[in-house]
């Protein structure tokens, strides 16, 4: 057990009793009286005999727990000094005192034992953590060796392919093999409470703080406990996910956090843990975190029109969403990032299928199809029906994915600027490459107000109204902010229209004044020519 166990080791003393060597063993918790009684018993003397202990050279030895140990070659000699004559009363008093002393001794022993047990537990926890790291590293080495063997076999059998597209995955995943170094923030009670609400301000937090918030969500929902997720693996996985979001204006790690936080708030707001299994909650949260992994900043329309590698690979069918799924499971395939390592194979199959279904549902090209199916099931919604539950989960992740306008205006509006910036980057590229440009992405045709009004009115409000039928609490918390947002952008559009009308009138007046100026000049010149000379 290590050095810590030496404190429990008993002490052995050797006595010379009439030429016979007697070994006496006692623990460090014995007092002097106990040891003296033990020596008396060993030498056949009465227990109340006062004795002295002598070394081989007749030096006296103190009889107490700290007395120096000896060996069989250097035994101590026991010399009786006197036999105490005690009265019955004194014996009774001594007995009581002995019992009191024993109780005190036990109390002190308990405190000492508590301290030592605490130290041992700390040592064991550290050892378990180190052993866990070793297991992860061993699994990583096995995986690396397997991949190297497969690569060698593939190289031996590889032939030249005339295809212009490379189907090798050149994306560099960056899991952390060491223990993650981002600081573990202690979230205040106020932050923990705010984190459960849709009004949470996602702009106030740095990436490390967002990672700590995500980590807290998995612990708070009981997912770490129920699926035996290694906390170190959870942190590695979150770091790797963070590193595989690009620095796009909109589709970045903050958007990932925003969507996941909204999912987390809906779990608490709608009491989803009462409706879904813990595996469903795990799928919802993990799909939300992974739903836009490695997003390039250009949507599916661009991928298909530009015939990119992703469009070719996935046959124009939700190329981005398929790519997000692929990256998610490439990360999870690495032992040091596999948060599902303790989940049985059948459970992992269900989790994988669930995540794929939800991430593919975030393709807005499928919005009408999914909404129609959900509305059909809403007439007789059955929580015991797996198909109904799957559709509800698809709607939930869709709500969270496009939920910015549910948040307070000061939190939501900056996201519109980010989205338009990404749209304009794409439309500029489409123009330069001679590809079709969507009007809602063209910087020459769209404004913030026009971009939002139609989206809120025809996409967001109908979807959240449908969810409200199952969860009435959503109306006040999430639907009402959408109505207010619609009114805000309609007022903004009226102001924009008024400004355009005023600008148009100003331009007309300026243009008219410019055209009339030459005519007046010509008339003045003609009058001057007609006037008589002086």
Curated annotation (Swiss-Prot):
UniProt: Mg(2+) binding residues: 292
Cofactor(s) of this protein: Zn(2+); Mg(2+)
Listed InterPro entries: HD/PDEase_dom, PDEase, PDEase_catalytic_dom, PDEase_catalytic_dom_sf, PDEase_CS
Main EC class the enzyme belongs to: hydrolase
Active site positions: 251 (proton donor)
Entry-linked PROSITE patterns: PDEASE_I_1 (PS00126), PDEASE_I_2 (PS51845)
Catalyzed chemical reaction(s): 3',5'-cyclic GMP + H2O = GMP + H(+)
Location of region: Disordered: 500-534
Activity regulation details: Specifically inhibited by BAY-73-6691 (1-(2-chlorophenyl)-6-((2R)-3,3,3- trifluoro-2-methylpropyl)-1,5-dihydro-4H-pyrazolo(3,4-d)pyrimidine-4-one). Specifically inhibited by PF-04447943 (6-[(3S,4S)-4-methyl-1-(pyrimidin-2-ylmethyl)pyrrolidin-3-yl]-1-(tetrahydro-2H-pyran-4-yl)-1,5-dihydro-4H-pyrazolo[3,4-d]pyrimidin-4-one).
Record's compositionally biased regions (Basic and acidic residues): 517-534
Chain positions found as Phosphoserine: 318
Amino acids binding 3',5'-cyclic GMP: 251-255, 292, 401, 423, 451-452
Residues binding Zn(2+): 255, 291-292, 401
Keyword annotations of the record: Cell membrane, Cell projection, cGMP, Cytoplasm, Endoplasmic reticulum, Golgi apparatus, Hydrolase, Magnesium, Membrane, Metal-binding, Phosphoprotein, Zinc
Main location: membrane
A molecular function (GO) term: 3',5'-cyclic-GMP phosphodiesterase activity
Biological process according to GO: cAMP-mediated signaling; cGMP catabolic process; cGMP metabolic process; negative regulation of neural precursor cell proliferation; positive regulation of cardiac muscle hypertrophy; positive regulation of long-term synaptic potentiation
Pathway as given in its UniProt record: Purine metabolism; 3',5'-cyclic GMP degradation; GMP from 3',5'-cyclic GMP: step 1/1
Cofactor binding mode and count: Binds 1 Zn(2+) ion per subunit. Binds 2 divalent metal cations per subunit: site 1 preferentially binds zinc, while site 2 has a preference for magnesium. Tightly binds zinc.
Subcellular location: Cell projection, Ruffle membrane; Cytoplasm, Perinuclear region; Golgi apparatus; Endoplasmic reticulum
Residue span, PDEase domain: 175-496
Coiled-coil blocks: none
Cross-referenced PANTHER family: CYCLIC NUCLEOTIDE PHOSPHODIESTERASE
Function: Specifically hydrolyzes the second messenger cGMP, which is a key regulator of many important physiological processes. Highly specific: compared to other members of the cyclic nucleotide phosphodiesterase family, has the highest affinity and selectivity for cGMP. Specifically regulates natriuretic-peptide-dependent cGMP signaling in heart, acting as a regulator of cardiac hypertrophy in myocytes and muscle. Does not regulate nitric oxide-dependent cGMP in heart.
Membership in a protein family: Belongs to the cyclic nucleotide phosphodiesterase family. PDE9 subfamily.
Protein's recorded name: High affinity cGMP-specific 3',5'-cyclic phosphodiesterase 9A
Organism in which the protein naturally occurs: Rattus norvegicus
Lineage, top ranks: Eukaryota, Metazoa, Chordata, Craniata, Vertebrata
């Amino acid at each position: 057990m290590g050095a810590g166990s030496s404190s429990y080791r008993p002490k052995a003393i050797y006595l010379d009793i009439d030429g016979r060597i007697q070994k006496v063993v006692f623990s460090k918790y014995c007092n002097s009286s106990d040891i003296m009684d033990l020596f008396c018993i060993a030498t056949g003397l009465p227990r109340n005999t006062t004795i002295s202990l002598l070394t081989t050279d007749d030096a006296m030895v103190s009889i107490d727990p700290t007395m120096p140990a000896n060996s069989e070659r250097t035994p101590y000699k026991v010399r009786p000094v006197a036999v105490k004559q005690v009265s019955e009363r004194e014996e009774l008093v001594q007995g009581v005192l002995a019992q009191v002393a024993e109780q005190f001794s036990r109390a002190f022993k308990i405190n000492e034992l508590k301290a030592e047990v605490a130290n041992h537990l700390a040592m064991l926890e550290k050892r378990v953590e180190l052993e866990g790291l070793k297991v992860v590293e061993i699994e990583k080495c096995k995986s690396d060796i397997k991949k190297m063997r497969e690569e060698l076999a593939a190289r031996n059998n590889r032939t030249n392919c005339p295809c212009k597209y490379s189907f090798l995955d050149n994306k560099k995943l960056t899991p952390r093999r060491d223990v993650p170094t981002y600081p573990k923030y202690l979230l205040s009670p106020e932050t923990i409470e705010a984190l459960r609400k849709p009004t949470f301000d996602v702009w106030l937090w740095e990436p490390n703080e967002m990672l700590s918030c995500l980590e807290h969500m998995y612990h708070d929902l009981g997912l770490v406990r129920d699926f035996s997720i290694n906390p170190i693996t959870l942190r590695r996985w979150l770091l790797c996910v963070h590193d595989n979001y690009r620095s796009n204006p909109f589709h970045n790690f903050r958007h990932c956090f925003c969507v996941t936080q909204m999912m987390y708030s809906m779990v608490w707001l709608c009491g989803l843990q009462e409706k879904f299994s813990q595996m469903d909650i795990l799928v919802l949260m993990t799909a939300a975190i992974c739903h836009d992994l490695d997003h390039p900043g250009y949507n599916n329309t661009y991928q298909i029109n530009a015939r990119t590698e992703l469009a070719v690979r996935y046959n124009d069918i939700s190329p981005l969403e398929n790519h997000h799924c692929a990256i998610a499971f490439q990360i999870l395939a690495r032992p040091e990032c596999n948060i599902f390592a303790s989940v049985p194979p059948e459970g992992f199959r269900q989790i994988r299928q669930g995540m794929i279904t939800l991430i593919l549902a975030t393709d807005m090209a499928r919005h009408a199809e999914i909404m129609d199916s959900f509305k059909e099931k809403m007439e007789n919604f059955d929580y015991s029906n797996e198909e109904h539950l799957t559709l509800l989960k698809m709607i939930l992740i869709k709500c969270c994915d496009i939920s910015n306008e549910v948040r307070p205006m000061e939190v939501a509006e900056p996201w519109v600027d980010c989205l338009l910036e990404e749209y304009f980057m794409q439309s500029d590229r489409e123009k330069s490459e001679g590809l079709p440009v969507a009007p809602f992405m063209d910087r020459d045709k769209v404004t913030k107000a026009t971009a939002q009004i139609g989206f809120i009115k025809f996409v967001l409000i109908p979807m959240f109204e449908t969810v409200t039928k199952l969860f009435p609490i959503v109306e006040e918390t999430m639907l009402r902010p959408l109505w207010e947002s619609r009114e805000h952008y309609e007022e903004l559009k009226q102001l924009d229209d008024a400004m355009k009308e005023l600008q148009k009138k100003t331009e007309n007046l300026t243009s008219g004044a410019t055209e009339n100026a030459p005519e007046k000049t010509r008339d003045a010149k003609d009058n001057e020519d007609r006037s008589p000379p002086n």
